[in-house]
């Protein structure tokens, strides 16, 4: 396909970073966001001052104010919006989608209230004939946008299509592996955010590196157990979208979910912690839905349960973190 073109839907930190990275190789990359004032600022400044300050846009990255034009321009649509707004975005873009479009989901989360995987939301709204891929992996926005080496995973049921898209999206700083396990990639991207909250809490009450490493390891086990019963390939969790994303999100200072956990452990209220982080915290948004899945599939997930008790039952942080270890004995 010589006329390859990409539109990224979502002009937050992650969507902007993906668009910047993709435009280092592709000449037709468009970025659209729902806030018109924000998009006009991006167009004027050639930089996302709010979410990724001091990172200038490549010349080949076009800022598009019109959703209709942004969708019609492209044969590849990448959705990078918070999970809470994912369904509404699909409904909005549906009338404008080109036939045989490649749809790539960069959102890490579950459908609110139901706990459904986002692939099921896509198939419900756009049909099961949709050529859907999932992109995930350890890829914090700032590092990706400035061109630091990054490895990600792209999943598609058709491995030939997956390899084609991965080749189009990757560049000398971004490597993208191709796999066919959509379920495993999604589960990894969801669970790691809650584990990162627990990791941050452990750091916030100074439990030490031994405890944090144990939480990460236990978290990988919970990810594996839920993924396996939902039909994922166990080897997916040993890769970039599993242990790779988990380790980064649990240990790096750029992690919103980890910051949120640290602040809660330091005594901040949930609302004040959310405000101080200043961005969407997917682990907080999705924990109820993860519990729905664990109950449905009869999977014991001690970390998920204990973080839930902190967030919704006002259980003290230290008690919950210690309970994680007690439940593992």
Swiss-Prot record:
Localization of this protein? Cytoplasm
The highest taxon in the source lineage is: Bacteria
Which of this chain's residues are annotated to bind sn-glycerol 3-phosphate?
108, 137, 139, 192, 245, 255-257
- Please list the reactions this protein catalyses: sn-glycerol 3-phosphate + NAD(+) = dihydroxyacetone phosphate + NADH + H(+); sn-glycerol 3-phosphate + NADP(+) = dihydroxyacetone phosphate + NADPH + H(+)
Q: Which InterPro entries match?
A: 6-PGluconate_DH-like_C_sf (IPR008927), 6PGD_dom2 (IPR013328), G3P_DH_NAD-dep (IPR006168), G3P_DH_NAD-dep_C (IPR006109), G3P_DH_NAD-dep_N (IPR011128), NAD(P)-bd_dom_sf (IPR036291)
Which SUPFAM superfamilies did the record assign?
A: 6-phosphogluconate dehydrogenase C-terminal domain-like, NAD(P)-binding Rossmann-fold domains
Q: Read off the PROSITE patterns from this record.
A: NAD_G3PDH
Q: Its pathway?
A: Membrane lipid metabolism; glycerophospholipid metabolism
EC main class here is oxidoreductase
One Gene Ontology BP term is: carbohydrate metabolic process
Q: What is its EC number?
A: 1.1.1.94
Q: Name the predominant localization.
A: cytoplasm
In its UniProt record, a GO molecular function of this protein is: glycerol-3-phosphate dehydrogenase [NAD(P)+] activity
Q: According to its UniProt entry, what is the function of this protein?
A: Catalyzes the reduction of the glycolytic intermediate dihydroxyacetone phosphate (DHAP) to sn-glycerol 3-phosphate (G3P), the key precursor for phospholipid synthesis.
Family recorded in the similarity comment: Belongs to the NAD-dependent glycerol-3-phosphate dehydrogenase family.
- Name the NCBIfam families for this protein: PRK00094.1-2 (NF000940), PRK00094.1-4 (NF000942)
What PANTHER family does the entry give? GLYCEROL-3-PHOSPHATE DEHYDROGENASE (PTHR11728), GLYCEROL-3-PHOSPHATE DEHYDROGENASE [NAD(+)] 2, CHLOROPLASTIC (PTHR11728:SF1)
What name does the UniProt record give this protein?
Answer: Glycerol-3-phosphate dehydrogenase [NAD(P)+]
Q: Species name for this entry? A: Wigglesworthia glossinidia brevipalpis
